[in-house]
Amino acid sequence: MEKLTILLLVAAVLMSTQALIQEKRPKEKIKFLSKRKSIPESWWEGECSGWSVHCTQHSDCCSGECTGSYCELY
């Protein structure tokens, strides 16, 4: 009887630990995704250039495409 009680207690602890771990994961994903800005926010704050603006590298453009020294449309 004592062995069964101990086994049930261990199982309960393991299940509650697993539930806590799974509960924290979605919060971490939300924090990661919320740190990223949308393309319009980046453009509005001047972090990237819009369409048909002079550029020197892909990262200069909000679309990520610098072709022929000008930003491409998305």
Curated annotation (Swiss-Prot):
It comes from the Eukaryota. Belongs to the conotoxin O2 superfamily. One of its GO terms (cellular component) is extracellular region. This is Conotoxin VnMEKL-0222. Residues 1-19 form the signal peptide. It is found in: Secreted. InterPro entries: Conotoxin (IPR004214). It comes from Conus ventricosus (Mediterranean cone). One of its GO terms (molecular function) is toxin activity. The lineage of its organism: Eukaryota, Metazoa, Spiralia, Lophotrochozoa, Mollusca. Residues 20-46 form a propeptide. Keywords: Disulfide bond, Knottin, Neurotoxin, Secreted, Signal, Toxin. The presence of a 'disulfide through disulfide knot' structurally defines this protein as a knottin. The cysteine framework is VI/VII (C-C-CC-C-C). Expressed by the venom duct. Disulfide bonds join C48-C62, C55-C66, C61-C71.
